[in-house]
């Protein structure tokens, strides 16, 4: 019989992969808490309109990648392809637009139908941070600083470069869009098929092209910096000043536009050279219209998301897990005492496992297999004396001690 396999583009996260995944989440959760973020959990599926209307009808995610289906009531629902839209929906649904700003951390699975490749899956996992209700560029810098600190504490920050850009406000984007279309229209016949479509529907997305010839044409294209109105230029200058105050290095990259249509002003990506062409490990930007599009009042916001699988791949080593203590009763008569000792150790925060089966040799082999740091041996003589034998497995040293002293001996 053929063994069942996970669906293409999905994976089982177990063993070393699970430890790496857990380490990324716990590090991000702890650092986000230092910035005042509260953790939210939103549903993994939403009404399709939450994504289709708000991510941009021309975005690749909406046009090509969403897992959308009708439920048994005929309602169109979609497995979430990203986290920001759901968080903004939750803010409005729960009446939290009057208690701003809100800083939100989230983590969990996302779903996109795209070609699986290194570090990219159809079910993947993200961590994310949103700061909603803050209109100042300092909020953008603080969100970026949080992302930078997470990368640093994971030990991967030194190999990653922060790229920033501004998309300006609506007036600035309109002026830039006109200049960009005027320029690219002269070379329309040379553009890739995808960029020809984008030239009509969403010209700024051409800046995100991966086509080599498109990139060549863009080298001489107008830059948005020349089309910013005073307010947008001041916002961008404020962002750069705040990043410098945080001690965060960055490069300006006029091609950073991100994949969703809800962004304005700030767009940024942390890029690694260790993951090939798809090198972005954390990215985001400002979205000042998204909450209003969800039915809430005009509410500014800024945030980012990062792929857990991709960050886990960058870790230099698998995080160590606490080495347990193996509790080994020599016979059935000692099992009750073994259970009592297991309970005592675990309540004291010491990882402990029991080795019940086989002879003493097999039980010690199991203790070594689970990488136990010590074994607590309980025989009939020790039981009668209210004692145990503590064996240190790295060096084989052992000694008898009263049960009452076991916790202190194990530290």
Curated annotation (Swiss-Prot):
Keywords attached to this entry: Aminoacyl-tRNA synthetase, ATP-binding, Cytoplasm, Ligase, Nucleotide-binding, Protein biosynthesis
EC number(s) stated in the UniProt entry for this protein: 6.1.1.21
One cellular component term from this protein's GO annotations in UniProt: cytoplasm
PROSITE patterns named among the record's database cross-references: AA_TRNA_LIGASE_II
SUPFAM superfamilies the UniProt entry points to: Class II aaRS ABD-related (SSF52954), Class II aaRS and biotin synthetases (SSF55681)
InterPro entries: aa-tRNA-synth_II, aa-tRNA-synth_II/BPL/LPL, Anticodon-bd, Anticodon-bd_dom_sf, His-tRNA-ligase, HisRS-like_core, HisRS/HisZ, HisRS_anticodon
Presence of the UniProt keyword Ligase in the record: yes
The reaction(s) this protein catalyses: tRNA(His) + L-histidine + ATP = L-histidyl-tRNA(His) + AMP + diphosphate + H(+)
Record localization: Cytoplasm
GO-annotated molecular function: ATP binding; histidine-tRNA ligase activity
Pfam families, A to Z: HGTP_anticodon (PF03129), tRNA-synt_His (PF13393)
UniProt xrefs under HAMAP family: His_tRNA_synth (MF_00127)
Record PANTHER family: HISTIDINE--TRNA LIGASE, MITOCHONDRIAL-RELATED, HISTIDYL-TRNA SYNTHETASE
Record family assignment: Belongs to the class-II aminoacyl-tRNA synthetase family.
Subunit structure: Homodimer.
Protein name: Histidine--tRNA ligase
Gene label: hisS
